[in-house]
Amino acid sequence: EPYRRQRQMCIRDRPETWPDFSLKKQTTPYEYRYFLNVCTFGYTTPYWDWERWEKEIDWMALRGVNMPLATVASEAIAERVWLKMGLKEEDIRAFFTGPAHLPWHRMGQLNGWDGPLTDGWQKEQIKLQHKILNRMRELGMEPIAPAFAGFVPTAFAERHPEIQFKHLEWGGFDEKYNAYVLPPETPYFKEIGKLFIEEWEKEFGKNTYYLSDSFNEMKLPVAEGDDDGKHKLLAQYGESIYHSIAAGNPDAVWVTQGWTFGYQHDFWDKASLQALLSRVPDDKMIIIDLGNDYPKWVWGTEQTWKNHDGFYGKKWIFSYVPNFGGKTPMTGDLQMYATSSAEALHSANAGNLVGFGSAPEGLENNEVVYELLADMGWTADSIDLDSWLPVYCKARYGGCPAAMDSAWQRFKETVYSSLYSYPRFTWQTVVPDTRRISKLDVSDSFLQGVELFLSCADSLESSSLYVNDAIEYASYYLSLIHI
């Protein structure tokens, strides 16, 4: 089972009674410890049942997560809203994608693909979300719920020919799958947004944090060079999104992903982002600066918070995207993960930094990364990997022989010294797409690390997690050089 293989630590040789230890108080410098990614609900969790969700929520609680993303059942609530707006059920269902594509539907990038959703699906998602939210709240977490971002079904656009809807494109999909977004000045924006919050809270109870992203990886349809028009439109959208949320719950806080501000850094210059934020109260917005690992390894820029002066007074969360697209190869810049957030925390330019987060698009891979990031949420300082890795090995495998320590030194210097968003095995490059091929480490040093890891079998073979990782690392290396 994937959960047993990855999302746990070792309980081998557990004593009948535990020895006394002196108490140590560990505090966090962060008000919020965020976890999950909109895309996780497509790459990993779309078909999870309550049993699997319960384990993941327990995993979060044990690592101090207090602000998880919770978007299950978004479409069931949206369906109620669109029915109240006069649409027919079949037109609403045609708007939704299939379950595995719902993250991109929620961000307005994709409609109708692999849909529709069934009545049974909608009802079961409501039941599941009740269990998810109840458990999160029982454990002291404040979940981030979805909010209206302006995207409407084609049937709604057809009912209102008087409105000049803006058409947004994404990913090269045909126009019939693209989004129509309400112009910010129409009263429908506030009306629909208010209805969504009300319907959500009627079903699931009061919530404080609501996620809304209107332009993720999409550009506004504005004339090239018309900066004044662009900034005016962005300011209107920021104002409309905020007021549509506040109309449903005056105490609510608008949460938005900062991914696209770095991903499309040419579009989101300082003046453009300042315009979007300009009409939103500072205490009513949180920006999740999602992918602080991508400026170095993919975009070739400064980290987004640096480019935008700590987000101009808004609260923000320092986060990484340690997994892209649910990929499984061993990758991740451990040294960056052990230092970069601490550097931000102590920066004079950090602005109102209030949280730390991990936003993997896919789970059940590279567990060392998730454990390291969980620990970074509980320290204001960098972590010394030479000291931390043996502790990790003891927790995961029940021991750390000298050969294990040496193995992880080699892993740290090879596969875990970089991050690649599109890693490919040899068998995946028969028809190569050079834009999406990234280096995978096949060095002698990595092979030595695998051999050293396997040499620990005599002392650690009773650890199921050691056996799991030994098989995974060996098969991973063989797949790189032979397949």
Regions flagged by a language model, labelled:
Residues 12-31:
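N-terminal carbohydrate-binding accessory modules
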Residues 30-49, 60:
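Active-site-adjacent substrate/metal-binding segments within catalytic domains
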Residues 415, 419:
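Catalytic and binding regions of secreted/periplasmic enzymes and modules that target cell-wall glycans
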Residues 15-17, 36-40, 61, 66-412, ...:
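Catalytic-core regions of glycoside hydrolase
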Residues 1-7, 11, 482:
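Single conserved hydrophobic/aromatic residue that forms the stacking wall/gate
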Residues 424, 429-481:
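Histidine-centered catalytic/metal-binding microenvironments
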Residues 24, 48-51:
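Catalytic and substrate-binding clefts that recognize carbohydrates or anionic sugar/phosphate headgroups
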